[in-house]
Amino acid sequence: MTLDELQKQIVGLHEEVPLLDGSKRVYVNFDNAASTPTLIPVQEKVDQFCRWYSNVHRGTGFKSQLSSWVFEEARTIIARFVNADDTSSVIFCKNTTEAINKLAARFHCPAAGDEKPVILTSVMEHHSNELPWRKVGELVHIGLASDGTIDAHDFERKLIQYRGKVQLVAISGASNVTGYINPVHEYARRVHEIGAQIVVDAAQLAPHRPIDVKKNDDPEHLDYCAFSAHKMYAPYGIGVLVTAKNIFEVGAPEYVGGGTVDVVSLENAYWKDLPEREEAGTPDIVGVVALAKVIKLIEEVGFDSIIHHEAKLTAYALRKLSAMPDIVLYGDTDPGSADQRLGVISFNVKGVDHALVAAILSYEGGIGVRNGCFCAHPYVHHILGVSPEGVRTIEKHILERDRSRLPGTVRISFGMYNTKEEIDRLCDMLGTIIRKEYKGIYTMDSERGEYCPQGYSMDFSSVFTL
């Protein structure tokens, strides 16, 4: 299958959505950094499997044995997708957030009075690669360069400053705010030279670039890696932790119960080997099937085609947006380097609240974007130049349930199926907003931080019911 063919296989690609004026228009989805739609071949594979679905492991019935075989075949496909060797294990989780929390739980907190290990991370991180590590040790942040990239010199300084104390470096494969791609293998080499390990949050990277954790004896090996299927055109509730086995082979599992034990008596419990010991209860077998199918589709199309298409879209969007004087872009704005980043672009419209821009695009343009801080508050505060005092004020307002004055940006993010025509449509709507020619009168719900047009409400039940 070619990319051109796969682009036509997006579920819901031609669905129309209602607009404020009573008309309908084909939906434009520029929110792929949050989640992607599924693909028709993935949907069909799930439907096909559901005829044979049964619970996995230890069942003697044909459907149970088939489901168990499919489950483990999928694990092999996923391991191959990231080039993991037999010193690593693929553990299924709900999503990237759970995967990183599961890993963090294995890095035990020191006893009272003992020196805490240092966890190095960056200001760029998604909260899911920041908050779990706060429980583990002393979290030290690598600074950012003026363009919002990770400061390589500060990274080196921190490695030297905390040499002998750094236990782990937690870094994102790519930013969900600016689309920057981090040189994780270069980082891995340096991290291993000082005797530490590295975990890569690859949630944003996985749909757009190949992931290579490399063999265990490679200096650039990624010790741990996590990603989610819902950002890879398989939103069926599965995530993956690719992990070195040894850290999970001692002690009790994080969650205990069915499927985690070899034998239980009233006095003892003896845990299974990986990965079963860390997959308590009935797993999301359907989600695993969906992820395996989309991986095979991506491999068939090839990442080169995906990268080329998304880079063209990103360059085109940057040129169009840069030509609009009232648009403020954040991060790298050079169309010539579009192939060195992801198609994630954050911007604001001068003099217009980011939440209002997003609302007008939705209600009057049928265009789905995301606005705010994208679960990366410190990073967005940094690129917006919010002072420490400003951050304290933001915290105060939120604790008072007032989200009407929060800083943020508008984010567009491309998938392999988006088009230049959709970007043109976005820019036309932005022009309407800049000229203040939009039709609705919008009011802010201060508790939610969202704008809605007066006298209008969505009748969702006319489109879908349970």
Name these PLM-found stretches.
Residues 1-466:
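Pyridoxal 5′-phosphate
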